[in-house]
Amino acid sequence: MARIRGYRRKTNYKGFFVVLFLVAIGALVYFASQSEIFEKKSPEIIIENAGNFWNPKTQTQIILKDSSAIKSYSILATLENGEKVLDIQEVVLDKPKELKLFLPVPQRKLPEGAKISYEISATDWSNSNFFSGNTTLKRLDFTIDTQAPKIEVIASSFSISYGGSALIIFKATEDNLKKLVVSNGVDEFVPFPYLKKDYYATLVAWPVKNKSFTPLIIAQDGANNQTRYQVAIVKKLKGYRDSTIRLQDKNFGKVDELAQMLVPDMKFESQSEKFRYINESIREKDEKAIFDASSHFEVNMITRPIIFERFYPLRGAQVVGSFGDSRHYYYKDKNISNSYHLGLDMASVANAPIIASNPGKIVLEQKLGIYGNTIVLYHGLGVSSLYSHISNFKKALGDDIREGEVIAESGSTGWAFGDHLHFGILVQGQFVRLAEWMDGKWIKNNITSVFQKGEKIILRNQK
């Protein structure tokens, strides 16, 4: 075939540039979508301590958060009838990634029980949504509540001893109660509903670890209105023994035995360090297990006064170690460890039967370190009894125990020198003075009679 001189085939550059343009646009859109300036995550609106009830006098904090910064926010408040009582719109030019402010209060006074709704919106500086940014809207509905709970003490123990216990019966009136506790100034105690609605009974302890005692009933409602009512109870400052114990080399045998049993792989630089670890760290671990077992219980309505019999778990026993003893251990004239003795040591014959003085339920049956084989028996109203250094368990975890039943036998497990029982009483996990709970007269005057007085007043008020 003959070739025609001067002919040249045309190239379609137009189509090529169209494809190239579309690819470029696609890449631009993709990279823009992945870019921080086009991020699509909406701002976060956090309202602190917001419930269904609100006291305008309390400050409610709002936190606005966004990774691309907050551009603007608005707050609109309307009443139940649709009336607008607040309308705020703000542009935030300094571009904070976190903005804190307080929920604004309408200028007009709102009546008790009024319904108010807030709509809070926040928009960020992102260029997404056609450069308008991402917006979050949050709605809050409140009932106005400015009245604090009312507290009235019905009956209480006249006095409390350092290390001892007291019973308080009171009335707390509030339809929207969020928190109700009784405090000794340090620890908090859960009240038990007693007889009728709004009435409560609580045993409170003054542990030896606390040098002061301030009995307070603290009630807080859903709008965070709070009442702190101080109960008038006479404080008796009973002293406890302060013991200095000088250790000799022969005293470390039991420590070596416990360390080998409890922490066989742990290395100690000295006998003093080993003694301190066993006496303080292992003791702390034991007492946490005891606290957990004796402070977790069902809070049920008490339908009649609780009658406690005096506790005396070991018949014919002698006391060989007192409660509240502050012990300071010295080795070669150096103080190496300190601890409190939070029970009563009682000795009788070897493997003596341990008797439950009051009915209860076994909530702990465990081999501990310092305390050895241990039972905790829960009796109700936050009261538990402790039995340690046991040789033989006679009952099992979860068993319901009747008054007078044998639950175990005394022994020398744990850190015990000779067969004896370490006996303790706890009020909601706090060790208390044994002499009170082993005294029938004290129980009658400080527990039983207070229950009965409270019952009489409550039933009279219901008529």
Predicted segments with their positions:
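Short edge beta-strand/loop segments characteristic of extracellular beta-sandwich folds
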Residues: 59-66, 156, 164-173
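Non-catalytic extracellular/periplasmic "stalk"
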Residues: 165-167, 178-322
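Catalytic cores of peptidoglycan-degrading enzymes
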Residues: 308-457
